[in-house]
Curated annotation (Swiss-Prot):
Part of the 50S ribosomal subunit. Belongs to the universal ribosomal protein uL1 family. It holds the Pfam family Ribosomal_L1. GO terms for biological process: regulation of translation; translation. InterPro entries: Ribosom_uL1_bac-type, Ribosomal_uL1, Ribosomal_uL1-like, Ribosomal_uL1/biogenesis, Ribosomal_uL1_3-a/b-sand, Ribosomal_uL1_CS. It comes from Rhizobium etli (strain CIAT 652). Keywords: Repressor, Ribonucleoprotein, Ribosomal protein, RNA-binding, rRNA-binding, Translation regulation, tRNA-binding. One of its GO terms (molecular function) is rRNA binding. One of its GO terms (cellular component) is cytosolic large ribosomal subunit. The keyword Glycoprotein does not apply. This is Large ribosomal subunit protein uL1. Gene3D superfamilies: 3.30.190.20, 3.40.50.790.
Length: 233
């Protein structure tokens, strides 16, 4: 039964062909037939080797149409900054007490923000938050004194990205229920951010391949030039 369903979903998708972005979005949306609102993910293969420090790609992008998911935000802060975080809508706010909770294995948040003075304390959580990609980092705006702005950005569609070992960077950029225009705008915003994050050590062709897929659907390869007009080399 599952095999038949998979074959039917895959019908019409040529794994050797590159599709225009708008066509690819339509194909992915048509095949997102699960009983839940599937996440649409974009994947980019980059011409970098992240084992070298000068070829690391990472950053954050605010998607114009949000991600469609509820993001739970934790903030490490004290005093007025803790109050600011709560007023901005942070789900969890604390200092030493929150560190103890996280060390105990209770992680009820998706994104973590800290004020700079809290980092010596938060640094103890590296082994817990690091592997989950949740360690606060000034490069992506999660170590900041503007906690209200960071909380609102996180809840409003901010997406962090970081290249993996094979030179791949990917992210969920929306839901199957989004209209095609919203998905296109989000994909272009993500691709633009990745291109702007091109490291000094990257040589030759930077964006090699781009593909999109839904949670349960097949990957659809896209013509790189149809995703962004920015140079890919």
């Amino acid at each position: 039964m599952a095999g038949k369903r998979t074959r039917k979903i895959n019908e019409g998708v040529d794994p050797t062909k590159l599709y225009a972005l708008t066509q690819a979005i339509g194909m992915v949306k048509e095949r997102a037939v699960a009983k839940f609102d599937e996440t649409i993910e974009v994947s980019m293969n980059l011409g970098v080797d992240p084992r070298h420090a000068d070829q690391m790609v990472r950053g954050v992008v605010n998607l114009p149409n949000g991600t469609g998911r509820t993001v739970r935000v934790a903030v490490f802060a004290r005093g007025a900054k803790a109050d600011e975080a709560k007023a901005a809508g942070a789900d969890v706010v604390g200092a030493e007490d929150l560190v103890e909770i996280v060390q105990g294995g209770k992680i009820e948040f998706d994104r973590c923000i800290a004020t700079p003075d809290m980092m010596p304390l938060v640094g103890r959580l590296g082994k817990v938050l690091g592997p989950r990609g949740m360690m606060p980092n000034p490069k992506v705006g999660t170590v900041t004194m503007d906690v209200a702005g960071a909380v609102k950005a996180s809840k409003g569609g901010a997406v962090e990205f970081r290249v993996e070992k094979a030179g791949i960077v990917h992210a969920g950029i929306g839901k199957a229920s989004f209209d095609a225009k919203a998905l296109e705008e989000n994909i272009r915003a993500f691709a633009d951010a990745v291109i702007k994050a091109k490291p000094a050590g990257a040589k030759g062709n930077y964006v090699k391949r781009v593909a999109i897929s839904s949670t349960m659907g097949p990957g659809v390869k896209i013509e790189v030039g149809s995703v962004t007009a920015a140079p890919t080399a």
